[in-house]
Amino acid sequence: MKTNIIRLVMLVFTAFTMLTVTAKPKDRVVVAYVCSWTDLRLPAPTLMTHINYAFGHVNKTFNGVDIQNPPFLEKVVALKKKNPALKINLSIGGWTSGNFSEMAATQANRTAFARDCRRIVDKYGLDGIDIDWEYPTSNEAGISASPDDTKNFTLLMRDLRKALGNKKLLTIATIQDALYIDFRACVKYLDFVNIMGYDQSNPPMHHTTIHRSPLSGHISLEEGIDAHIKNGVPPEKLTLGMPLYGRGDHSNKILDKFMKTGFTDGRYVERWDSIGEVPYLVDKTGKLVWGFDNPRSWAAKCQYIIDRGLLGGMYWETTEDNAQRDGQMTIYESLLKNNKGTIPLKHVLVLTSGKSSVEASQVVDELKQLGMKRHFDVTVLADDAAYTPEYFDRFHLIYQLNADLSKLGNEARKEFETYVDASHGAFFAAKDTAVKGWDWYNTFSQDLRVCPLNQKYWSNTAKMGRNLFCVGNNAKAEEVVELLNL
């Protein structure tokens, strides 16, 4: 009897513990870093709960903050009109951002800096401050450092909390190892901690595996979470950072554009690390040359966040994503919408003449059947439909079936040209036809190769970064879908 009672008590305690450490879906956060130098594209404000605007820097007199591109910060803050629940912080620091050590070294400097942070929060209508000091006591990034930095970091958090008050947010970004910071001393001042779950190695190792595998670099995400918890950060105060970019040789234009286009020129093959739960590209020798994430691995990481009872996820940074925002959509649907790792649908746009024909109906039906099997949806539009700005960017593939493209208005033509020239997606034209009055399209179509559909072809202008395009091949829809790996 006594044994049974003990077991019952232990079960109740375990259940209570799980309930208390697991972040509830309504409380879960998704933090997006938005960079000051990416002011040509604002983020979609409904896909995250928090934005960290990067960056501000400690000023040269160690007693205040300099903000990069203040007009863009104002535009980011204005996104609250579209999502009033959105929280926006100024992130101060970043790799090679210095003057932290000198600022944190004296009470006078810390107090002045903290007061300036509060002034900026009030001036711009911000919700708080994020500190990204990389890293206390370390001069690896070419910044000044002192053995006293760890102690002074805690004092800085104390002084920032005092200046900001309890109604404003105070967060930090940390290295996966949980080094350089006395978390037990300073976590009480923090709302949460953003683990930078990326950049832990270079090829031939992967920089962001969930679990340790033969391809893992310095540390896995699992080990990084464990290190933070061991050093005093409760799971409900942790967010796990995920990259929206790949890591490898960025001077290689094919690899550098892979995250945007999803295609290579045939020299590289995509593989999956079943232990680390991440994809990667290998060259002809089988060597890893590009470590990255895709919807499958982002969904796996989000599920791991849920399973570990963390507060949420974070990512760097919004413009590294492709035009369809696959990374951001995966993280949003997984953590905020469905409460489980979810791979979002891809999207195919079929352009038709609007006139019914047996051939067109068969192609559309075939695409819809394929979509149910391969996880994409199909939108069919007549050639005289109205288009909103950035409409084409929603789609991973535009399938030009039998539309009369001469009916597209000037605005729609500009959007289509951007879609093509900036590699925002793939295009397939079932027939090779000129478009009266559209010189750009006629030049573009003449430059394309006819795809035999037995290998992936790039256009002759691949060096300009254009995506994979096919014109003039009467291929079946299934062949096109297979070619584009939808």
Predicted stretch roles:
Residues 51, 90, 131, 160, ...:
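Conserved, mostly hydrophobic/aromatic
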Residues 92, 237-304, 330-339:
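Glycan-binding loop/region signatures in secreted carbohydrate-active enzymes
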Residues 31, 59-71, 115, 136-267:
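Substrate-binding surface in catalytic domains of secreted glycosidases
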Residues 24-121, 333:
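Glycan-recognition patch characteristic of GH18 chitinases/ENGases
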Residues 359-364, 368, 400, 405-485:
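A glycine-rich, often tryptophan-bearing local segment used as a flexible ligand/cofactor-contacting loop or short
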Residues 1-25:
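Bacterial Sec-dependent N-terminal signal peptides
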Residues 36-40, 368-391:
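A short, well-structured beta->alpha microelement
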Residues 24-26, 345-375:
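Short, charged N-terminal beta->alpha structural module
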